[in-house]
Curated annotation (Swiss-Prot):
It is found in: Cytoplasm. Belongs to the SMAUG family. The gene is smg. Residues 1-37, 801-822, 854-864 have a biased composition (Polar residues). Keywords: Cytoplasm, Developmental protein, Phosphoprotein, Repressor, RNA-binding, Translation regulation. This is Protein Smaug.
Amino acid sequence: MKYATGTDNAMTSGISGQTNSSNSASNEMQPTTSTPTAVHKEATSTATTTATYANGNPNPSANPSQSQPSNALFCEQVTTVTNLFEKWNDCERTVVMYALLKRLRYPSLKFLQYSIDSNLTQNLGTSQTNLSSVVIDINANNPVYLQNLLNAYKTFQPCDLLDAMSSSSSDKDSMPCYGSDFQITTSAQCDERKLYARKEDILHEVLNMLPLLKPGNEEAKLIYLTLIPVAVKDTMQQIVPTELVQQIFSYLLIHPAITSEDRRSLNIWLRHLEDHIQAAAAGLTNRSYFLQPSPQLVAGGSSTGSGSCSSSATSSSTASCSSVASSSLCPASGSRSSRTNDWQTIAPPSKQLQNKLAGDWRGSGGGSSSGSINPLCDNLNGITLNELASSQNSLGLSLEGSSSLVNGVVAGAGSMLGIGGGDDHDTSFSKNGTEILDFDPVTANMGEACSLASSSLCGRNGGNPVEDRSQPPPNLQQQLLQPPPYASILMGNVGDQFGEINRWSLDSKIAALKTRRSNSLTTQTISSCSSSSNSSVITVNDNCSNSTENLAQFANKPRSFSLSIEHQRGALMNSGSDTRLDEFKPNYIKFHTRNVGMSGIGLWLKSLRLHKYIELFKNMTYEEMLLITEDFLQSVGVTKGASHKLALCIDKLKERGNILNRVEQELLTGQMELSTAVEELTNIVLTPMKPLESPGPPEENIGLRFLKVIDIVTNTLQQDPYAVQDDETLGVLMWILDRSIHNEAFMNHASQLKDLKFKLSKMKISMVPKMHHVKPAGVGPNNGNINKPRWNGKTRKCDSKSGSNDRINNRKNSNDMLNFSLNCLPHPLPHHSQQAPPPLPQFDYNGYGGGPSHQPQYKSSSYPSFMGNPQQQPPPPPSSKSHHHPQQMQQMLQQHNHFPALPQQTPPQSHRRSLNNLILVAGGPQQPQQLIFKPGQGVLTNNGSNDNLGLERNQQPQQQQQRKLSGGVSSAEQQPKKTMAAVVMENLAKFDQHFTLF
């Protein structure tokens, strides 16, 4: 749906006859720069067609006569809203616009932002009151001027200098005038306060300046807050009108400069104002000028007055005032029991009766005034703003169910803030720091019923009044024509909109959403001050006001609870799991701001672990951030250590240009390694930078220099064959590119950065993975042994109980035959049992022998480093025996002739960890024949058993040759060649009998 606000034709195309007020209202929505032209007519036609299509006509080319009712209905709705808007004062309009803007999506908000900026520029340049506007803006943020104004208000005594009222605020004529009801004259002269004849005029001045307060101006904000207690007391004494104080409360409750601590202190005085209005409505106090009964409501049967300025008042402000006053008196009527909760404790919509509207409208007599307001006000149900209030009543105000409904400006603003009520009212609970509603969102039907004031005037079908049982009595129709309370107009059907509200905000003033963990099982409350005297209340308020001295300009950041004097013990005990774990989520750190180059300030502060001070930079420009000094940080409440660290980091930001220039020059000349350059880029990528296209001298364009260095580094990695392509350097560089893609400064170059990252990823994949590092021989604690220590035979466990060196086999597949006793085995060579011959160096079988060999036991021969490593080979035997391998083998067989000669077999493939079950008997890798004995294939025998085993055909010639050579070989040379005996003697301590395992 689009608003046809282009020309007069757009507004009058569906409305045949309108009053002058309607025409003027529609004209105010038109642009003020040009008259209707052909271009405007074409644009109007397009807007009308689009609006028709959005209203339910799916065919844009349909007959225009068919779309006439839809256009007429839409234009009537716009006219109704415009008429209501005209009846409100400036504060009411501001609250309405604030609430409606929160329901728009981001594109619409940006469009309105551009429109507002354009209108402000045009009005400031062409308006005749531009000088006065500038003066008001300056005074609104001038603490000296505001302090003088506050002193004048506190020390003022009413006088009769009515001629001094001519210099009061510019909007004084549009506000209600109560001069005839307030003429307490004294003989005192006003002197320097003659410009402010009454306190009411000072409040008018404050009301004009309060919206212009800039967030971060702590001194001015404290002066505004100090005025509230005095103004509320004057309202109770009937010195100033209630409406002015309500409007000031409205601005303060929605102002971005007000923190949650400030709202807690404001709620104390808001409670007193509410009690005063309730007591005045019930007739418990003397009625003042703004609580006189209205002739219209008295004639209608109401027992209480509406409180208009005068019966003949016709201005829009007077009508609005009458509406606010009449709505504030509703609880005093006969049907007061129909609403048991006030505006802070409204029940959710799922717990209401569906026919509540019709039931209230059927009321008569004294209950009519209350029934006319309830149908509109009940649409406030289910409103919980996660960004401004928590589920445990963050404002800490606990009200009873019998409190009255504070309508008007305060009701609307308070409802938008979600000011909590009693402990028994339906709140939301927390799940992992996210608030979840206890009730269903507001349904579309109820939202459509009362989302606008036009719903009480005309239906959706044609704009005619509803003619059924739900139609209000005739004496209430004029009341319904008056604008209802703010909350009833603004807050219908917004429960389902907060998903969009929490994500997008206007002008970054409410971008710091509520992220602290909610206390799901406890309700935070503060002690009630209503039963105490006024002096005690003032003391509590002063303490609460002083609680904002630390980091005052951090407008929306909830402060952590401490044991300071301003925090009450009850709040500390009820704080629950208030740990702020979810306070700095990514969507909070990267807030949306219109200041160029400042969107990434949160990530930079997070990298410095100073993200708790992110609120300090929310409204700063890039240039202002670079000018921050340590003294300034300490003056605003930053701790000494944090201010020193932050000031140093800001000074380093100014040196980024020189650093990038130096890195660029050293990379081009080859004086810097790539890893060093990548490290410098890592330190800069998270810092705030302006976009490349931002105006300014080239030497201050940090983003452009940053991209130049990245280009040099990546080109070097891709093209230079001598560049060290380290996997770690590539990974860090890809991380830098990833952070640059999401940086505000490189948004227009994201595609190029993505392509570059893709090329680097392919290069990283194509790199050869790192191989296992091999230690050289003779280096290290193991003397060059690169094998695992647990496989070293010397480190295996031995049987220490029996005193033997027999290794304990702990594996499941260990051969138990190694542990049995061999005393029963006969042996034909008893002289070998008492000798332990030393191993022969040239026959080192997997480390069983001595010498310089470091090969571990039980290693598989398939590993090339075992037998093929020349550094680990045993020294060769003497030259006289180096070429006698066949003769040596025959001598071995002669020594061990009690072993049978088996056919040569190929060793099976087995895992290296199972080799401890085998004993290999071989002459080395170069032997022509190897005797391999496997379990179960051999028998124990002696010299006489050879004839029974079927020797091979070549066994006899070998034995004969051995007998011939046996006489010439000494016993000393033959004894080391008993390899089988050497193996057995090293593994088992003292053998009486020889054995073999087959």
